[in-house]
């Protein structure tokens, strides 16, 4: 349906103050930032992605992460998606859009490439999380982005006409919300920012996460 080489990606990142509240460690703020940085690192290596922006209440993050940050003035993920979409259109992007969650520290560029290749055959597509109930990534080739992120979003996105891509894509499905999720990601192999924290942070190091090469 499309040449999938011109995807613009929106990464909604609420704020460091409220991110990863279910991670039962005191360094959750540092982990949230590391997850975001590793997610962005994988995205920016893709030849199929023309631009990546982050939408966040922490607009000053841009200097830290090296990615444009658009000020989030909404009340949730879907508002952030709309803010990012509007900004991209105002700045000349009229191609295809993807939304990727910011908590994919094990993300491999190959998985996002495979997803975009498969998604290019459908007007709208998405990937469910490892539990099969949430959404880690969606795409649209239409003028507007309609999204319904949150609990049980996979079911809602299906009802909205998004095609679920049934590929394995393990690193794209593994969003990290809990310590158990983080252990699974560590076994898969996380990016360098998360791996550095797992090794250097005393609290995390004491949990003895397995650190496979990212």
From Swiss-Prot:
GO terms for molecular function: GTP binding; phospholactate guanylyltransferase activity. Phosphoenolpyruvate binds at residues 135, 150, 153. GO terms for biological process: F420-0 metabolic process. The keyword GTP-binding applies. The keyword Nucleus does not apply. It catalyses: phosphoenolpyruvate + GTP + H(+) = enolpyruvoyl-2-diphospho-5'-guanosine + diphosphate. This is Phosphoenolpyruvate guanylyltransferase 2. Guanylyltransferase that catalyzes the activation of phosphoenolpyruvate (PEP) as enolpyruvoyl-2-diphospho-5'-guanosine, via the condensation of PEP with GTP. It is involved in the biosynthesis of coenzyme F420, a hydride carrier cofactor. It comes from the Bacteria. Pathway: Cofactor biosynthesis; coenzyme F420 biosynthesis. It comes from Rhodococcus jostii (strain RHA1). It holds the Pfam family CofC. Its EC number is 2.7.7.105. Belongs to the CofC family. It is an enzyme of class 2 (transferase). Keywords: GTP-binding, Nucleotide-binding, Nucleotidyltransferase, Plasmid, Transferase. The lineage of its organism: Bacteria, Bacillati, Actinomycetota, Actinomycetes, Mycobacteriales.
